[in-house]
């Protein structure tokens, strides 16, 4: 019985005490528990309780909190009850707490506290019990109240035989696998009982999977609710076509809204048996020979192609940039051969050139691969090579003369790669579904070995050979646009926009679009560009701002966050924007504001200083490849030296702005918290 964890000596009526905040309460609670000999180290216990609260609040029911302690400091399992007066617990509903159940558990034994949470949750979801328990002032009063409502409990579920189909099944899982996991379960079951619904809820907590759903449960349910705050195995739910994904908090606070989604068939069928965890799985899962949800698959296919392309960009771009660095002594008199005079520089330049020449074919091929799997690779590569200008058909862009069989000296670049990859996939689908579908069984074996690779690729290449003409002009227009935007007047605006995009979603589609634009500018202009410099410098700003804020004011971050915050120095200097993601997730408003403002400033300054770089990646380690083309600064050495100095100025100013916003927000938030505590 879960009430056996309660005891008279662990009921504390502290309604006359005042606490600065919940951490002040936890400190005093740890001291009181050590005096009662249920823990042996109040400091260790306090740190464990504090860490748990910093992960996610345990104030999950109106006016009640369930902090839990799982630590080596616990001598024996216990539940301590604290009666307090309107303590701000930063609860989910933002209401003050009046009653606290502090649960202590041995490190290697979790069943007792899970039993308490599960059973007590059922009582708290009874509105009458929830209102009365907040008024108890003694251990005896609490026990009598629990006994009274335990006697009145009825079965939560109707008999299995009464219905064969569940109204919904659900899985609940939170990061720690304790309170939210079970509260979400109880909230869903209480809602189901109230509305006479037949349900089954599986929990995936610290005690493993309980009440596990079978394949029959899932397949025969009207819908599936995945109330999960962490990744679980989704492959079991593919057969159900009405799957809803929500947080445990949503399931706890608004189970009615969640059920309405199930009831109105607003769910979806999960993509091919599992959520893909990497790009290879994405490509395999999306390799369908049909046009179902094709518009949605296009977006994911392009991102997949970009991810395959990026290693070629980084490798080739950095090697080419290093060749210029090694050949720096010949910069002023090498003319068009700069980067190839020195033998080592020439070797690196040629090797980097091979890698760089493959980025368009790789992009095209893997866009097709992501849509139709392996059959898209051959036509995708071929049209990608045509896009990069490695075939016949030349256009004199100034007068529009087309030389059909002349070696190509123009390219459609990334425009051709994207369109060509999509065209290849579409034609594969058409061939599979309409052209070769009625072949006799004896010929099906050679369809994928001979017919589609040979005739399909020939047709795709011939069609794209013609379609590529307007794409060449589109790419030419982009080159003209970049030349215009590199002017002293418009360059700051270009940098401003790229800086905003780079810092918006840190590795997401908008960030990738800005970065790819910088890479495109490198390829189109065959030289260092402002776009690439703006993308790299502004992408370094978010992690560097966080690191500087942590160095100036440690209290902006939790103790556990500080090592990661300091590590952002290295992440930022290496141009790894993703180092800032954990901090953005935890404090999205302040971090996103700081990132956008600081990144936009950095990008605008990059344009104003006419900074350019030849390398697509590397951060501070490729700063020697920076240069400025500001008027009056002549000579490669001087342009590089001044360029490095101005790049550091851009970073320092942006870091100061970003860290100031983070620190300022922290000061304001803590001032408001102190003011609120005084008023209460």
From Swiss-Prot:
InterPro entries registered for this protein in UniProt: Bacterial_PTS_Sugar_Transport, PTrfase/Anion_transptr, PTS_EIIA_type-2_dom, PTS_EIIB-like_sf, PTS_EIIB_2, PTS_EIIB_2/3, PTS_EIIC, PTS_EIIC_2
Phosphocysteine: modified positions: 174
Record localization: Cell membrane
Residues found modified as Phosphohistidine: 68
Annotated membrane topology: Multi-pass membrane protein
Catalytic activity: D-fructose(out) + N(pros)-phospho-L-histidyl-[protein] = D-fructose 1-phosphate(in) + L-histidyl-[protein]
One Gene Ontology MF term: kinase activity
Ranges for domain PTS EIIC type-2: 298-675
Active-site positions on this chain: 68 (tele-phosphohistidine intermediate), 174 (phosphocysteine intermediate)
A GO CC term attached to the entry: plasma membrane
Keywords: Cell membrane, Kinase, Membrane, Phosphoprotein, Phosphotransferase system, Sugar transport, Transferase, Transmembrane, Transmembrane helix, Transport
Name of the protein: PTS system fructose-specific EIIABC component
Organism for this UniProt entry: Mycoplasma genitalium (strain ATCC 33530 / DSM 19775 / NCTC 10195 / G37) (Mycoplasmoides genitalium)
């Amino acid at each position: 019985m879960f009430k056996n964890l309660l005891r008279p000596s662990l009921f504390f009526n502290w309604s006359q005490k005042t606490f600065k905040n919940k951490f002040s309460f936890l400190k005093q609670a740890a001291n009181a528990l050590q005096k009662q000999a249920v823990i042996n180290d109040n400091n260790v216990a306090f740190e464990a309780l504090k860490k748990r609260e910093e992960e996610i609040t345990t104030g999950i029911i109106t006016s009640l909190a369930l902090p839990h302690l799982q630590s080596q400091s616990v001598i024996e399992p216990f539940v301590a009850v604290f009666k307090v007066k309107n303590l701000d617990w930063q609860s989910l509903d933002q209401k003050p707490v009046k009653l606290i159940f502090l649960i202590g558990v041995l490190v290697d034994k979790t069943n007792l506290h899970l039993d308490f949470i599960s059973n007590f949750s059922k009582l708290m979801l009874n509105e009458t019990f929830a209102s009365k328990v907040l008024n108890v002032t003694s251990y005896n009063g609490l026990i009598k109240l629990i006994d009274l409502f335990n006697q009145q409990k009825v079965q939560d579920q109707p008999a299995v035989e009464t219905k064969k189909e569940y109204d919904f099944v659900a899985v609940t899982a939170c990061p720690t696998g304790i309170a939210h996991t079970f509260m979400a379960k109880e909230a869903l079951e209480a809602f189901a009982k109230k509305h006479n619904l037949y349900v089954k809820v599986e929990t995936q907590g610290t005690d493993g999977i309980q009440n596990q759903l079978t394949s029959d449960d899932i397949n025969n349910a009207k819908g599936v609710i995945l109330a999960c705050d962490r990744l679980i195995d989704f492959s079991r739910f593919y057969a159900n076509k009405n799957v809803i994904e929500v947080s445990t908090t949503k399931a706890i606070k608004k189970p009615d809204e969640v059920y309405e989604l199930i009831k109105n068939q607003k769910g979806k069928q999960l993509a091919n048996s599992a959520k893909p965890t990497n790009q290879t799985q994405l490509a395999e899962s999306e390799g369908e020979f049909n046009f179902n949800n094709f518009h949605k698959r296009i977006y994911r296919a392009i991102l997949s192609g970009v991810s395959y392309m990026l290693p070629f960009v980084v490798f080739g771009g950095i090697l080419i940039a290093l060749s210029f660095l090694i050949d720096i002594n010949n910069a002023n008199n090498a003319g068009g051969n700069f980067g190839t005079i020195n033998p080592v520089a020439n070797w690196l330049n040629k090797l980097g050139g091979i890698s760089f020449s493959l980025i368009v074919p790789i992009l095209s091929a893997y866009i097709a691969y992501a849509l139709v799997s392996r059959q898209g690779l051959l036509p995708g590569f071929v049209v990608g090579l045509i896009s990069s200008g490695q075939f016949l058909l030349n256009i004199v862009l100034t007068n529009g003369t087309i030389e059909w069989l002349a070696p190509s000296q123009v390219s459609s670049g990334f425009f051709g790669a994207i369109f060509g990859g999509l065209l290849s996939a579409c034609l594969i689908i058409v061939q599979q579904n309409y052209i070769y579908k009625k072949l006799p069984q004896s010929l099906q074996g050679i369809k994928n070995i001979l017919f589609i690779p040979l005739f399909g690729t020939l047709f795709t290449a011939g069609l794209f050979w013609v379609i590529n003409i307007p794409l060449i002009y589109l790419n030419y227009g982009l080159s003209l646009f970049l030349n215009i935007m590199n002017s002293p007047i418009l360059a700051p605006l270009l940098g401003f926009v790229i800086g905003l995009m780079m810092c918006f979603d840190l590795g997401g589609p908008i960030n990738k679009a800005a970065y790819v634009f910088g890479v495109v500018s490198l390829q189109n202009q065959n030289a260092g560009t402002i776009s690439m410099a703006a993308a790299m410098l502004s992408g370094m700003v978010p992690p560097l701002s966080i690191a500087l804020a942590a160095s100036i004011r440690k209290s902006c971050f939790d103790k556990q966050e500080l090592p990661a915050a300091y590590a952002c120095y290295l992440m930022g200097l290496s141009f790894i924007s993703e180092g800032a993601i954990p901090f953005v997730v935890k404090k999205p408003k302040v971090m996103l504001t700081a990132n956008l403002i600081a990144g936009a400033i950095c990008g605008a300054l990059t344009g104003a200083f006419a900074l350019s770089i030849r390398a697509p990646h590397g951060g501070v380690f490729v700063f020697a490849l920076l240069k400025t083309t500001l008027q009056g600064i002549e000579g490669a050495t001087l342009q590089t030296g001044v360029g490095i100095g101005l790049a550091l100025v851009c970073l320092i100013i942006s870091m100061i702005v970003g860290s100031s916003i983070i620190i300022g927000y922290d000061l304001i938030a803590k001032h408001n918290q102190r003011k609120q505590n005084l008023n209460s």
